[in-house]
C-alpha cells in the first residue's frame, strides 16, 4: 500500500456525474487524498427510478476496499441458485451463483440502484465536495488547467475532468466538440438501440424464493428476476424492438408504455405458475427505457476522460454495468494516486500520458465484457436459430464450462492498487489469475456444439 501522506504533486479532479461511477471514483480519490469535486445535474443524488443493479465479486471487492460493502450487503441476500426456463417448458437449475461465492468470497447480489447511491453518498467522507443542480454547459482546456462551466454561471477549475455522467454525457459531447476531426465517425454512431426494457421491483410472490434468480427465455423476449431480502423481487423484461435506432435518435418510453408491455405479455411464464401479470400486480415501482449498446474507441482528449456508461453501455443481462464502472474508477484512481506521489507536474502532456495508460489498461477487458453482454441479450431473447440451439441444448449440458469461463472473467478484475486487498477475498482470484479475457462464445464453443446438434437431430428423426 502506498503512503498517500507523501504527496508531491497536487492534483485537482472535477467529476461530472453523481452516478455509481462518479461516487465510486470520489471514494477512491478521498482514500488517496486527491482534491476533487462532484457535479450532479439533478436535485438529488439518489432518486427512486424503479431500477436496480447487480453487484458481482469484481465490483464487490472494490466496494469492500472502499468500506461500503458491508452496508450494501445488509440490504440484500446472496443469490445461490439460478433457474432457467425455455418456451417449450424445459427448465434446469444451476448452483453457479453459490460456486462463484465459494471461489471468490463475494456473492452475486441485487439491490435498488437508489439504495446503492444512497449508501455511497452517506458513507462518503466529504459531502461538501458534492454539488447538486450543476448542469455542465461548457468545458475549457488550457495547457495549465481545465475549467467546467455550469448553467448557474459557476466555474470549477482543475487538472482533469472526468465524465461519469452516463449515456447522455455532457462531458462526452464537449470532448467531441473540442476533438472534432479526431473522433471518428464510428464513435459518433457507436451507441445503438435494438432492445427496450421494463425494470420493476415487486413485493414477495409465493414460489419465487429469496436467494434465487430466474431466467425465462422466449422468442424476442426474456424475463429475468432476482429475489432479494425479505422476498422482494427485482425484475426486468427485455424486448426486441422492430428496428434498430442509432443514438441520439432513440425512442423514449413512459409509464403507460411499461403498463402496455406488461399487459401484452401478461401470460408469459416466469417460473412454475407465476407469470408476468404477477410481477406487475405486485410491483412497487416500474419504468421502461431504451437500452443503448455501444463501446467507444476514443475515451479521452487532453484533460478530459470518460468512464462508466458514457463510454461503454451494455444490456443488463449479465449484470456488469455497475461493476465495470467500478473497475474504471479503481484503475483511474490508482493511476492518479501514483501521479500524486511522484515528482511529476500536471501539464497537459503528463495528464494525457496517464489517461492513455488508463485506456490501455481498460479497453481490452471492457470490450470482452461488452461482447459477453451483447451475446447474452441475444441468447436470452433467442435472436436466431443458432442462439436458440445454443441456449436450449448447449448451455444446460456444459454448466461446468460456463462456471469456468465465468470464474476466468471475474478473476481478471482490477483493484484499487493503493488499498489493501480485503481479507474475505477467496482463492479464486489467484486460482484463475492470468486467464485470458473472456468474450462472447466463438468458434471453440460452436465446435463443442456440433456433436450435441447431431445427437438432437438423430433423436428428432428417429424417436
UniProtKB/Swiss-Prot annotation:
Annotated EC: 1.-.-.-
GO molecular function: FAD binding; monooxygenase activity
Pathway the protein takes part in: Secondary metabolite biosynthesis; terpenoid biosynthesis
Coiled-coil stretches: none
Miscellaneous comment text of the record: In A.calidoustus, the austinoid gene cluster lies on a contiguous DNA region, while clusters from E.nidulans and P.brasilianum are split in their respective genomes. Genetic rearrangements provoked variability among the clusters and E.nidulans produces the least number of austionoid derivatives with the end products austinol and dehydroaustinol, while P.brasilianum can produce until acetoxydehydroaustin, and A.calidoustus produces the highest number of identified derivatives.
Family: Belongs to the paxM FAD-dependent monooxygenase family.
The protein's name: FAD-dependent monooxygenase ausM
Upper taxonomic lineage: Eukaryota, Fungi, Dikarya, Ascomycota, Pezizomycotina
Amino acid at each position: 500500500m502506498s503512503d498517500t501522506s507523501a504527496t508531491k504533486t497536487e492534483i485537482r479532479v472535477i467529476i461530472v456525474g453523481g452516478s455509481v461511477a462518479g461516487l465510486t471514483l470520489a471514494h477512491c480519490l478521498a482514500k488517496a487524498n486527491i482534491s476533487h469535486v462532484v457535479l450532479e445535474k439533478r436535485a438529488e443524488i439518489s432518486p427512486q427510478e424503479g431500477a436496480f443493479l447487480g453487484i458481482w465479486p469484481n465490483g464487490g471487492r472494490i466496494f469492500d476496499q472502499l468500506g461500503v460493502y458491508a452496508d450494501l450487503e445488509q440490504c440484500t441476500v446472496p443469490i445461490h441458485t439460478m433457474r432457467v426456463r425455455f418456451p417449450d417448458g424445459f427448465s434446469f437449475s444451476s448452483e453457479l451463483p453459490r460456486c462463484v461465492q465459494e471461489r471468490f468470497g463475494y456473492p452475486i447480489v441485487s439491490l435498488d440502484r437508489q439504495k446503492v447511491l444512497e449508501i455511497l453518498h452517506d458513507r462518503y467522507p466529504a459531502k461538501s465536495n458534492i454539488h447538486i443542480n450543476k448542469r455542465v454547459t461548457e468545458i475549457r482546456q488550457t495547457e495549465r488547467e481545465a475549467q467546467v462551466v455550469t448553467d448557474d454561471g459557476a466555474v470549477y477549475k482543475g487538472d482533469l475532468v472526468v465524465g461519469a455522467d452516463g449515456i447522455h454525457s455532457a462531458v462526452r459531447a464537449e470532448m467531441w466538440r473540442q476533438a472534432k476531426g479526431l473522433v471518428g465517425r464510428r464513435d459518433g454512431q457507436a451507441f445503438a438501440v435494438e432492445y427496450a426494457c421494463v425494470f420493476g421491483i415487486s413485493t414477495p410472490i409465493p414460489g419465487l424464493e429469496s436467494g434465487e434468480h430466474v431466467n425465462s427465455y422466449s422468442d424476442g423476449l426474456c424475463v429475468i428476476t432476482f429475489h432479494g431480502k425479505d422476498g422482494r423481487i427485482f425484475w426486468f423484461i427485455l424486448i426486441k424492438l422492430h428496428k434498430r435506432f442509432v443514438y441520439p435518435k432513440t425512442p423514449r418510453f413512459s409509464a403507460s408504455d411499461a403498463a402496455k408491455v406488461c399487459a401484452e405479455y401478461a401470460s408469459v411464464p416466469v417460473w412454475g405458475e407465476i407469470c408476468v401479470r404477477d410481477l406487475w400486480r405486485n410491483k412497487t415501482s416500474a419504468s421502461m427505457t431504451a437500452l443503448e449498446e455501444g463501446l467507444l474507441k476514443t475515451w479521452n482528449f487532453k484533460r478530459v476522460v470518460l468512464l462508466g456508461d458514457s463510454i461503454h453501455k451494455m444490456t443488463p443481462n449479465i449484470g456488469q454495468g455497475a461493476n465495470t464502472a467500478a473497475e474504471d474508477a479503481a484503475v483511474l484512481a490508482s493511476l492518479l494516486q501514483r501521479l500524486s506521489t511522484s515528482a511529476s507536474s500536471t501539464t497537459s502532456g503528463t495528464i494525457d500520458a496517464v489517461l492513455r495508460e488508463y485506456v490501455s489498461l481498460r479497453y481490452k477487458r471492457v470490450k470482452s465484457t461488452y461482447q459477453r453482454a451483447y451475446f447474452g441479450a441475444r441468447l436470452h431473447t433467442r435472436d436466431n436459430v443458432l442462439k436458440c440451439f445454443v441456449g436450449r441444448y448447449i448451455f444446460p449440458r456444459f454448466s461446468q464450462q460456463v462456471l469456468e469461463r465465468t470464474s476466468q472473467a471475474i478473476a481478471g478484475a482490477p483493484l484499487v492498487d493503493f488499498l489493501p486487498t480485503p481479507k474475505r477475498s477467496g482463492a479464486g482470484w489467484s486460482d484463475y489469475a492470468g486467464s485470458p479475457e473472456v468474450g462472447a462464445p466463438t468458434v471453440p464453443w460452436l465446435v463443442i456444439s456440433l456433436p450435441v446438434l447431431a445427437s438432437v437431430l438423430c433423436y428428432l428423426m428417429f424417436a
